Amino acid sequence: VASGTTTGLQSNNAALLAMLTSTANVLDNTELTDQLTWAFNSGSEHFDYLAVSESLVLTYTITATDSQFATDTQTVVITINGTNDVPVITVDAGDSVGDTLAVTGGALNTSGTLSVEDLDRSDVVAATITAFSKSGDSIGLTRNDAQLMAMLSVNSLVIDSAHEQGTLSWNFDSAGYAFGYLAATESLTLVYNITVTDTQGTTDTRDVTIVITGENSAPVISIEPGDSAAESIVESNTTLGAQGTLSVRDINTTDTVTATVTSVSPSGTTLGLPSNNPTLLNMLSVNTNVIDNVSETGTIYW
């Protein structure tokens, strides 16, 4: 007879009964007394489902029968006390411990799972993100460690008190941040420590690693307040001059941006124009170095 904590017990009564064996022939016809020997062997049943403070009581009845079918009985009681089994995180088929994401110009998202087991059936297992670290190219990164850590989330409840296995689901969401500062060949590695804790306070930890790889972002010329891309000049039989600025942005922080005048297209009244295209091209000059490798914005002076 099994009593105590039986929820989670894998063996049926027949299997439990077979775990106790006793001497078949105790007395022969020349003896009045002898010893009956019994032995308990659980075989492949480890009773790991028992948690701390839980126990299983197996009560066996041993019957001695003589040649005249007279009997006597004695109970043998086996008490199995539970101990704490630690939760264990594993990477099973379909699970993943991270992902590599390429910068796309928009928010970055990915998700995955890890498998968790705690053999103590009545224990509850919860998951939290307990630590974070980063490495790689971070010049130009405009998010602090707390904001980067908040980009990964996990489900809190992994295993309830009625199961031994559960799934830890993790989700990475950059919350609109594009990591556009990363240029081609650059990358940022984010490492999240995920810890599962059972009812007894024992833990297991696994890292989830997100690698973000950069891409080349083209520089963009714009006309901001105070800039100008045209000028009207009245000819006055002397050298003519004008100047202005254009704004430039390249979100790849480590890129350098230079400016050159590449073409000219005369239009309007060109009949009688003595200057050829190379001469006209040389009339407009710009600063060569627009953005250094530590900034995202710069100015073209023409």
Listing of model-derived features with the role each one plays in the protein:
Residues 78-84, 116, 210-216, 248:
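Interdomain boundary/hinge segments at the C-termini of tandem beta-sandwich modules
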Residues 46-49, 70-72, 85-88, 98, ...:
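Short loop/beta submotifs within extracellular cysteine-rich repeat domains
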Residues 1-18, 88-149, 220-280:
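Extracellular ectodomain surface segments
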Residues 11-80, 138-212, 236-237, 270-302:
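Acidic, turn/loop-rich segments in luminal/extracellular domains of secretory-pathway
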Residues 66, 79, 86-89, 104, ...:
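Exported/extracytosolic protein signature
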